[in-house]
Amino acid sequence: MRRRRAPKRPVMPDPVYNSEVVTKFINKVMWDGKKTLAERIVYGAIEKLGEKGEEKGIDLFFKAIENVKPLLEVRSRRVGGATYQVPMEVRPERQQTLSIRWIVDAARNRNERTMVERLANELFDAANERGAAFKKREDTHRMAEANKAFAHYRW
């Protein structure tokens, strides 16, 4: 284990929307260090979102991330030989990270032809409270609700 917590590294806002969240999203989409390709995919998806919905693409993008953010999650805790799933609140930074991760993973598992289409459709679904990423959030909340009895094991 490390002696102290690793310092948070600053994230540069992206050049198009001047947003750190978009940069984090691009970094999550990126594979093998191909950032230019990841940028093309994310910006293309946001543009497509704007054509799909009646709102601006970037507004739908933020709405999608907001809708997928989990408020509660379960974490394993060992107590006297038994492992309990303890529901806990999620810190805001982790909420954002999980939201981005779930959206990107859900987009990768979709069946559309290009990643731009997959990402745009997943973001659109998430903005409208449906789709695989939103379902993942609901499942997480359901798990936390089911294990509410173990909430007193929180640490």
UniProtKB/Swiss-Prot annotation:
InterPro entries per the UniProt record, alphabetical: Ribosomal_uS7, Ribosomal_uS7_bac/org-type, Ribosomal_uS7_CS, Ribosomal_uS7_dom, Ribosomal_uS7_dom_sf
Task: Cite the SUPFAM superfamilies for this sequence.
Answer: Ribosomal protein S7 (SSF47973)
PROSITE patterns, alphabetized:
RIBOSOMAL_S7
Tell me the GO molecular function terms. Answer: rRNA binding; structural constituent of ribosome; tRNA binding
Q: Which residues cross the membrane?
A: none
Keywords (A to Z) from UniProt:
Ribonucleoprotein, Ribosomal protein, RNA-binding, rRNA-binding, tRNA-binding
Q: Does the keyword RNA-binding apply?
A: yes
Q: What's a Pfam family in this record?
A: Ribosomal_S7
GO biological processes: translation
| Any single Gene Ontology cellular-component annotation | small ribosomal subunit
Q: Family assignment?
A: Belongs to the universal ribosomal protein uS7 family.
Q: How is this protein organized at the quaternary level?
A: Part of the 30S ribosomal subunit. Contacts proteins S9 and S11.
Q: What does this protein do?
A: One of the primary rRNA binding proteins, it binds directly to 16S rRNA where it nucleates assembly of the head domain of the 30S subunit. Is located at the subunit interface close to the decoding center, probably blocks exit of the E-site tRNA.
Q: What is this protein called?
A: Small ribosomal subunit protein uS7
Q: Which organism is it from?
A: Nautilia profundicola (strain ATCC BAA-1463 / DSM 18972 / AmH)
The lineage, from the top, is:
Bacteria, Pseudomonadati, Campylobacterota, Epsilonproteobacteria, Nautiliales
